Every structure is written in structure tokens, then in C-alpha cells.
């Protein structure tokens, strides 16, 4: 909405989102899994002053609970963005069961669903490209936070857990693991910080830097989460310990 250039839509929709009264999401990915302009096949057809949307979207975060859905669909002029009410007639929403058990993803099916055009018809892909870059930077920062959390958890457990008469953190094998985790997490921070600067400047480096940051930070997070379980041993493999949650979240973040 912010980058759409549609002042009327911003004035109408942003206050509710900012106040937490409106749960909003972006319906972009389709069954083909493509993240490119030609991969968008859902359609929107003009119907007087309104638009009718048809097609399906998959892996939509909070798609089954959102009260506002921004949908990317193809019109005669190209990819465009539309605001759709979460309870709109003709919209079928199905929650997806995911490995991380958050149940935040959904499949959405549109059958002559009414939507309101946001911004300029045919200019939706330009907006999406920028938004996806900014989202990649935000995800990289989230991955750094997760990596930092599992690093601290592993180090603390290595100090507390005693084996063979001394803390396991005093053994070289564990020290190497913690050192590798620290190296990756700190490197990920640097990548995320630089990507954040590019996002703030909206400079020409943003697309490539955002992709690089997300790729590296996701790998660092997943490796740190896996090593955290290894250092914790048996308890790290139980449902009662949060290590498994970070492991699954780290894996899911690699796919986003």
C-alpha cells in the first residue's frame, strides 16, 4: 500500500493495519511456485466500476485469518494489485498444515471475487518487486535474531551441562561448534545491516544485496539451529525444549 502510490487506498486501509485492527496479507505465490511476473496467472476482469478475480494462491501467510488480502492478478494491462475482503463472496480459504506447526499458511481460491484496484492498472509488478526486496531484508533480520537466540542458548547450556566432571563447553569439540556458530551469526548480522542500509536508501544495490543477505542469513540460522540441538543432545530433540521450534522455523525461513 505504501509503495502503490494510491493515496486513497493508503488513507482508507493503512490506519486499521497500523492500529492492529486489520490483519493484512499479500496473496502472490501460485501453485506453480514461480516468483516472476510471467508466473502470475490469476486474472482480474473489469466489471463496471469493480473487478472480478479468478484463480488461486498458495502459501499465503495468515491467508485463512486475514481481514484484508492484497492480491496480485493479471489484467489486460498486466499484473495489477487488488484489495479483497477476507470474507468476500466466492473466496475459499483453506489452512495448510506445515512442518513448523504455526498453521500460518493458507490456500486461497477465487471465483468471481470482487476486488478494488490499488494503484495503477498494469503497474503491480513494479510495486511487488520493491516490496519483495524489502521483505527479504526484513526476513534476513528475523533470521539473524533467531540465530542469535540459538547461539546464546547453546553457549549457556554448554556452561551448565556437566559431563565427565566438567562443563561440556570446556571440551574443544563443543568450543569449535560455538565458535563456528558465532562466526556465522556475526557475519549474518553484517549482511543484514548492509541490506538494511540499502533498503533505507532504496538504492540500485537493493535487489542483489537483499537476495544475498536472505540467502546467507537463512543458511547461518539453519546451521546454528542444528548445532544448538547437537550441543543440547537428547533434551534438544524433545518437544518440551524450544530447540526444535527454532530448527523448524529456520528451515521454513530458507524456503521463503
Feature annotation, model-predicted:
Residues 39, 59-60, 86-117:
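Flexible, small-/acidic-enriched active-site or ligand-binding loops
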Amino acid at each position: 500500500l505504501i509503495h502503490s502510490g494510491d493515496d486513497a487506498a493508503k488513507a482508507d486501509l493503512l490506519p486499521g493495519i497500523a492500529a492492529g485492527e486489520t490483519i493484512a496479507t499479500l496473496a502472490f505465490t501460485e501453485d506453480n511456485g514461480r516468483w516472476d511476473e510471467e508466473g502470475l496467472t490469476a486474472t482480474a476482469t473489469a466489471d463496471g466500476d469493480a473487478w472480478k478475480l479468478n484463480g488461486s494462491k498458495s502459501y499465503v501467510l495468515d491467508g485463512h485469518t486475514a481481514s484484508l488480502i492484497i492480491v496480485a492478478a493479471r489484467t489486460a494491462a498486466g499484473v495489477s494489485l487488488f484489495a479483497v475482503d477476507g470474507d468476500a463472496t466466492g473466496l475459499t480459504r483453506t489452512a495448510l498444515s506445515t512442518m513448523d506447526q504455526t498453521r500460518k499458511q493458507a490456500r486461497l481460491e477465487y471465483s468471481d471475487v470482487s476486488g478494488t484496484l490499488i494503484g495503477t492498472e498494469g503497474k503491480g509488478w513494479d510495486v511487488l518487486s520493491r516490496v519483495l526486496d524489502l521483505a527479504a531484508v526484513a526476513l534476513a533480520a528475523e533470521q539473524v535474531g533467531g540465530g542469535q537466540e540459538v547461539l546464546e542458548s547453546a553457549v549457556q547450556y554448554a556452561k551448565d551441562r556437566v559431563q565427565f566432571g566438567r562443563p561440556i563447553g570446556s571440551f574443544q569439540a563443543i568450543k569449535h561448534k560455538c565458535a563456528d556458530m558465532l562466526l556465522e551469526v556475526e557475519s549474518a548480522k553484517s549482511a543484514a545491516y548492509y541490506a538494511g542500509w540499502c533498503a533505507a536508501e532504496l538504492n540500485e544495490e537493493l535487489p542483489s544485496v537483499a537476495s544475498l543477505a536472505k540467502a546467507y542469513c537463512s543458511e547461518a540460522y539453519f546451521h546454528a539451529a542444528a548445532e544448538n540441538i547437537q550441543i543440547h543432545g537428547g533434551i534438544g530433540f524433545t518437544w518440551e525444549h524450544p530447540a526444535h521450534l527454532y530448527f523448524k522455523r529456520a528451515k521454513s525461513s530458507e524456503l521463503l
